[in-house]
């Protein structure tokens, strides 16, 4: 469910007068996504996406998100482009919410990606990292090491309701990662949420990246580790080394990882698995019964975390010769 704020046709038509987008012919809510309210608009010019930013999105972060999409599109990356109003502003207001019009991106996300798709994802992620160079607005990653501690403090007391022994396992893991987290690897703007539903394909060709609302400044290789976790495990929890090899080789073909980044990848992958475990755990424990939100299983990412603990070097992810 991704329409938290309803809008009327009259409100929408009035909102659109602030833009040079033609006249509204139809609109409908989009069910996918969990953070914002999204609508697909058809106009006499082009199809558009209307996004109303809900309370979980900080209004002060919106210039970063919208500006980043503009910057990336100007650099040639295929991603949604925020449309300016007639007064030049990117952000408006509708139904009491900050709102923006975004260009419509053709494509669909893949339910069953193959290794060839993972290779394209690696290439696109590296292209995004390179294209983001020169983007001057900064946004720290609130879901890095310090954020993990905050999430765990909120969840620790009830964690064993999800699986017995979690309290004994997770606190030492956070402490270990905090003590060993790399500080001097290449950094820049990362997507931070490049899951399957945020990558569009037309056939086997990647048509674009979407949903930059977790983007922030952090280690570039950390973004690679997020993709390993999101794209390279099967439904039964097994790591698919063929997909991992393809994703890493695709990335390296555009932006080669340094020796230090490759060496850090198992640790970074533990960290990114922990990050999604903790946010899922918090949501699992705090989402009210009957809420129109599908709760995601935190234990999926606990199993990935445990897998990464067994990895001695990046060759085990599929990169031969490392």
UniProtKB/Swiss-Prot annotation:
Pathway: Amino-acid biosynthesis; L-threonine biosynthesis; L-threonine from L-aspartate: step 4/5
Top-level taxon: Bacteria
GO MF assignments: ATP binding; homoserine kinase activity
Keywords annotated in UniProt: Amino-acid biosynthesis, ATP-binding, Kinase, Nucleotide-binding, Threonine biosynthesis, Transferase
Top enzyme class: transferase
GO biological process, one term: threonine biosynthetic process
Family matches, as Pfam families: APH
Catalytically driven reaction(s): L-homoserine + ATP = O-phospho-L-homoserine + ADP + H(+)
Alphabetized SUPFAM superfamilies for the sequence: Protein kinase-like (PK-like)
Enzyme Commission code(s) on record: 2.7.1.39
Family of the protein in this entry: Belongs to the pseudomonas-type ThrB family.
Protein name in UniProt: Homoserine kinase
Gene (UniProt): thrB
């Amino acid at each position: 469910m991704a329409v938290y704020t309803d809008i009327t046709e009259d409100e929408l038509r009035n909102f659109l007068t602030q833009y040079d987008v033609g006249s509204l012919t139809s609109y409908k809510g989009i069910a996918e996504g969990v953070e914002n309210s999204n609508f697909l608009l058809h106009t006499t010019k082009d199809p558009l996406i209307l996004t109303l930013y809900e309370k979980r999105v900080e209004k002060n972060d919106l210039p970063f998100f919208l500006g980043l999409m503009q910057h990336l599109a100007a650099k040639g990356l295929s991603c949604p482009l925020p449309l300016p109003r007639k007064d030049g502003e990117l952000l408006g207001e509708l139904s009491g919410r900050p709102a923006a019009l975004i260009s419509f991106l053709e494509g669909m996300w893949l339910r069953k990606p193959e290794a060839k798709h993972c290779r394209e994802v690696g290439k696109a992620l590296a292209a995004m990292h390179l294209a983001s160079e020169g983007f001057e607005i900064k946004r720290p990653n609130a879901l890095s090491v310090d954020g993990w501690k905050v999430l765990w403090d909120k969840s620790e007391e009830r964690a064993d309701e999800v699986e017995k022994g979690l309290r004994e396992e997770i606190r030492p893991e956070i402490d270990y990662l905090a003590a060993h987290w790399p500080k001097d690897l290449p950094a820049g703007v990362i997507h931070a949420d490049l899951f399957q539903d945020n990558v569009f394909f037309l056939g086997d060709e990647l048509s674009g990246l979407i949903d930059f609302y977790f983007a922030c400044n952090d280690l570039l290789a950390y973004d690679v580790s997020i993709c390993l976790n999101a794209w390279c495990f099967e439904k039964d929890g097994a790591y698919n080394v063929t997909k991992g090899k393809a994703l890493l080789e695709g990335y390296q073909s555009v932006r080669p990882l340094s020796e230090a980044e490759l060496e850090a990848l198992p640790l970074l992958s533990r960290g990114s698995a922990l990050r999604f475990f903790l946010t899922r755990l918090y949501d699992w424990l705090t989402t009210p019964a009957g809420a129109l939100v599908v709760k995601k299983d935190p234990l999926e990412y606990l199993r990935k975390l445990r897998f990464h603990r067994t990895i001695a070097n990046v060759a085990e992810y599929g990169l031969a010769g490392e």
